[in-house]
């Protein structure tokens, strides 16, 4: 797993994310689906869009459950997360409409983040999982149709400081704590012992975001490319961010490996994967002077905050793809012709209702194929980038190699599933 994360994030995920972002910039901020239309044709775009939309619905449903479960297990994180939303709106208005400088706004915003965390610890919000799922569905509907500058962008920006702090604390804690792994480093290439789902190819479709994830291509081309100040920032944002995610994935492996055994099963049952990660990293942070309760709550808050950004971003992307699917182009003028289904409110409502229904449990039916579907998105995105690079006379070997590998592992995985 560790080798796949290290090799994958550098030679696969980084190339994939940067390639999708850079090609979108060169296509005037168009989505990866529109790039596929230009490089592989309308049929290719249609199939990709259907595939991507269903995948996004599963992402929204799954992450809604993950965030809701985290809020139930860590109610203080729920309070702080709601306060973050209010803080993001105030930050967006202050910077973009009232002329507050970014530097001053950042200092005030980070201080208010700490205040929100403190308030969350004092006033934890206890609600059931189903109630939280309903609240999250309302939130993502509003967030996905609101202008990017008022919520999505400031919220992600302020949340990034939580992530930087969490990674820094985790790495320092690991260095001082020097944890020993409670799980065996290797058992067999067929852990189940049944001849099914062996390490190859299942490892490469199970460990995704820390190595390579097709979802990233949708984000890079759907929202990120439209927010860059200059093309020169694409490498740091597209490639660099993937490397940072690789670091976070390494921390996750260490945390899970340290927890291990029976405690791992118990934590998974009472709070899910976020609970396991928070418990492990929270333990490491005790070496930095934090109490275990405060440290675990902080880590749970950080992860739930980023899971919520995934929720609203995935909903916005789902709306984009839904609108593209039902937008017709006038063959004479080449202009897009909208209809009721391409209305932002209608497209968002349909996306939220479908994912909300799936979050009640039906998404679990197709969840086993999600990993392979996500990685197949990555392979298709790399194919589109590779074809585009070839069409403009640029070398595309660094894209074709990871593309071929991802096609191989995903198709074998789908055949086994």
Task: Label the predicted regions.
Residues 92-97, 111-134, 142-144, 164-189, ...:
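Hydrophobic alpha-helical segments and their helix-loop junctions in multi-pass secondary transporters
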Residues 129-146, 172-179, 189-231, 235-240, ...:
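Hydrophobic, membrane-embedded alpha-helices of multi-pass small-molecule transporters
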Residues 7-33, 96-99, 216, 310:
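Juxtamembrane transmembrane-helix boundary signature
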Residues 32, 146-163, 215-248, 268-269, ...:
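Hydrophobic, small-residue-rich membrane helices and short re-entrant helix-turn-helix hairpins
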Residues 5-9, 51, 62-82, 100-105, ...:
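Transmembrane helix-loop boundary segments of multi-pass membrane transporters
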Residues 174-189, 243-279:
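Extracellular/periplasmic helix-exit of transmembrane alpha-helices
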Residues 15-44, 223-226, 230-233, 237, ...:
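Flexible loop linkers connecting adjacent transmembrane helices
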Residues 39-57, 240-247, 295-296, 308, ...:
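Loop-to-transmembrane helix boundary motifs in multi-pass membrane proteins
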């Amino acid at each position: 797993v560790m080798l796949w994360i290290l090799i994958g994030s550098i030679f696969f995920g980084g190339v994939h994310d940067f390639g999708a972002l850079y090609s979108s910039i060169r296509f005037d901020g168009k989505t990866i689906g529109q790039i596929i239309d230009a490089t592989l044709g309308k049929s290719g775009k249609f199939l990709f869009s259907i595939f991507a939309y269903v995948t996004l619905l599963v992402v929204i449903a799954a992450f809604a459950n993950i965030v809701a479960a985290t809020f139930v297990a860590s109610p203080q994180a729920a309070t702080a997360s709601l306060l973050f939303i209010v803080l993001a709106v105030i930050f967006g208005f202050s910077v973009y409409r009232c002329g507050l400088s970014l530097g001053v706004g950042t200092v005030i915003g980070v201080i208010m983040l700490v205040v929100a965390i403190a308030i969350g610890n004092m006033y934890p919000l206890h609600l059931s999982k189903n109630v939280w799922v309903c609240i999250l569905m309302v939130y993502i509907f509003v967030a996905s149709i609101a202008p990017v500058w008022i919520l999505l962008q400031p919220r992600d920006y302020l949340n990034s400081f939580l992530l930087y702090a969490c990674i820094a604390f985790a790495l320092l804690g690991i260095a001082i704590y020097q944890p020993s792994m409670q799980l065996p480093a290797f058992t067999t290439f067929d852990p189940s012992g049944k001849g099914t789902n062996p390490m190859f190819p299942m490892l490469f479709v199970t460990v995704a975001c820390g190595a390579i994830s097709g979802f990233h291509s949708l984000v890079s081309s759907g929202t990120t490319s439209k927010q860059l100040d200059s093309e020169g920032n694409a490498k740091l944002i597209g490639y660099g961010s993937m490397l940072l995610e690789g670091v976070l994935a390494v921390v996750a492996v260490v945390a899970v490996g340290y927890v291990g055994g029976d405690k791992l099963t118990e934590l998974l049952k009472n709070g899910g994967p976020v609970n396991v990660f928070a418990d492990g990293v929270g333990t490491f942070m005790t070496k930095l002077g934090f109490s275990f309760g405060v440290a675990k709550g902080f880590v749970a808050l950080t992860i739930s905050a980023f899971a919520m950004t995934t929720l609203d971003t995935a909903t916005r992307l789902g709306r984009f793809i839904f609108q593209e699917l039902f937008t017709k182009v006038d063959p004479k003028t080449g202009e897009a012709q909208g209809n009721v289904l391409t209305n932002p409110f209608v497209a968002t409502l349909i996306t939220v209702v479908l994912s909300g229904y799936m979050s009640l449990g039906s998404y679990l039916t197709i969840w086993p194929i999600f990993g392979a579907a996500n990685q197949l998105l990555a392979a298709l995105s790399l194919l589109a980038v590779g074809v585009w690079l070839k069409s403009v006379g640029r070398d595309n070997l660094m894209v074709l190699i990871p593309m071929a590998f991802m096609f191989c592992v995903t198709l074998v995985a789908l055949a086994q599933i």
